[in-house]
Amino acid sequence: MKKALTALIVAFCALLSLCVGASADESAEVYPYTFAFEEFWYEDAVALEDTLPCKAALLMEAGSGRVLFAQNETAKLPIASVTKIMSTLLVMEAIDSGKIRLTDMVTVGEEAAHMGGSQVYLEVGEQMPVSDMLKALVVVSANDATVAMAEHLAGSQSSFVSQMNARAAELGMSETHFANCHGLNEEGHYSCARDVALMTRELLKHPLVLEYTQIWMDTIRNGAFGLANTNKLIRFYNGANGMKTGFTDTAKYCLSGTAKRDGMQLIAVIIGADTSEIRFASAKKLLDFGFANYAVKTPERIELEPVTVKRGKAPQLAVTYDPPAILTEKGGKAPTQRAELPESVDAPVKKGDTVGRVVFYSGETEVAQVPVYAAEDAERNSFTNVWGIILGIIIGRK
């Protein structure tokens, strides 16, 4: 029995290595925050003691977009299959918008079936549900599944790539240009560590993707084809929840690794490491640094003075706000808060209407802002009500 079990395990491992395939390309929450900015903070970035052994690197806290470490972060470099973060983002947006469903069947075309690199060996005319295509794309970085999804969404890979570049522009990815949807070496295909963090941050806004990025081992084709995640952080790093690995001879070993602890979501980008081990060790070092030195905390709500109401039944309006979770240095001072409210508002006002804002500061630097909203309705005085008030005053004087 023991020998049979051992043989079964060996056979399964062999099957996994066959399914992944040898190739040049590696096969190895919606945030509730409302922040005052979308750009990175470089003035506060805290450097590690030494330079990481890779071409470029970046550590970012996803909720705020604050950069905690940056190394050669805007250099245009090949990123291999890390490209698929943008491909996955477009798929997730299509799912969330109702354009496609996880149960929809994808028919494999000629281009997808003849892709090289890491793959799940799709055949022309084969049909597979979107959910399994996503597993293949995200878990084992399958180029054929990526192209199949691109064709399913946009009609052709070239049209899909145009959408990728348009979305990159919308996200402010100024040092990025995609020439394909999978990341294999191609002229004019490049990105940078900062831009990889930007698209990773956007993808994290789609919670569904984490159901795929956190898969360690799974199957497709009704259990006939095994999958093993190329991202080793998922199995070995506490809190790891994504995102994408990549490798080509030109790009070397790349990674956008994500992890979440105690409500803080970090993104560690590594581009151009010489070995897979260096890639994961460097990402771990960045993540360890972030979790050791920073935390996300929600400040206490301060009591706000009511706002005067003009032409309202009641003279004042109660207002409130919801403090956001804010990134702070461990052991540092809590951010200060400053309410910005009008002297008065005109009735009518509906409960929930925005009437001002509260701004949060770290020293003199604005770090976040949230709206101040009406805690109740403020009805407008009608002519009848006004006349009644006047009449009451007159009668009261007698």
Regions found by a protein language model. Name each.
Residues 3-4, 85, 261:
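Hydrophobic alpha-helical segments, especially transmembrane helices
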Residues 22-207:
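Active-site-adjacent loops and short helices of periplasmic peptidoglycan-processing enzymes
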